[in-house]
């Protein structure tokens, strides 16, 4: 009798455990977004914004997934409020919930109310082409070819902040703030540079990791982690 009671208790416990586990697992939902949903085969970057949308940057345009369907945004030559180009380099959301899209032909800022894009220009009226971006306390820094642009939260302006010529044709493909006035710039094929945002002076870092850099990261203790091509970490 005791054995039978023990077995019944074990079965009841296992059943209860499975039921609780099933309820907990029910909070997770997995869905594959594939070619049949309209997603191009080459995904370059992904961003989840504060409203829960998933933004997908590809070589063939921009996608926004809301959990049910994928909406596509592509360049339209006759539409000044479409993205400037279909090749997406990077996406970033700032402290004001602006979503910035960095494309091959210019930077775009998503306008939620009209569901389209604002294309900022430089002082000559040309699109601002940037390959990387990073957040600061006061705004957003954008890395271009031998140039750094800055978007100011206070007056919502996007302007040229610094130029540098230590290396010609230096495309800033990665940006990180080392401290409040020193910017760590990375070019995929031309290595790392340290740019003083106050003076505009540029120099090489006090270590050599080669010129083919895949990625770079500054941790919470201000240590720099570099991933050279085929060179470990």
Model-identified regions with their sequence ranges:
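Carboxylate-rich, polar loop motifs that coordinate divalent cations or form catalytic acidic clusters
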Residues: 1-233
């Amino acid at each position: 009798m005791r054995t039978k009671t023990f077995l019944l208790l074990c079965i009841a416990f296992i059943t209860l455990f499975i039921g609780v586990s099933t309820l907990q697992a029910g909070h997770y939902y997995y869905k594959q977004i594939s070619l049949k949903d309209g997603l191009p085969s080459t995904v370059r970057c992904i961003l989840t914004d504060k409203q829960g949308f998933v933004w997908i940057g590809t070589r063939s345009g921009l996608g926004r997934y809301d959990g049910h369907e994928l909406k596509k945004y592509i360049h339209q030559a006759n539409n000044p409020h479409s993205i400037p180009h279909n090749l997406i380099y990077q996406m970033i959301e700032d402290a004001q919930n602006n979503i910035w899209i960095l494309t091959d032909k210019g930077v775009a800022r998503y306008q939620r109310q009209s569901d389209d894009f604002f294309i900022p220009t430089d002082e000559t009226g040309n699109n601002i082409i940037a390959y990387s971006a990073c957040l600061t306390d006061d705004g957003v820094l954008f890395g271009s070819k031998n140039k750094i642009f800055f978007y100011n939260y206070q007056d919502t302006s996007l302007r040229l902040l610094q130029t540098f010529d230590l290396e010609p044709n230096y495309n800033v493909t990665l940006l990180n703030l080392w401290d409040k006035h020193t910017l760590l710039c990375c070019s995929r094929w031309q290595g790392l540079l340290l740019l003083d945002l106050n003076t505009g002076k540029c120099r090489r870092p006090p270590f050599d990791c080669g010129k083919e850099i895949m990625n770079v990261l500054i941790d919470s203790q201000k240590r720099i982690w570099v991933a050279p091509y085929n060179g470990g970490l």
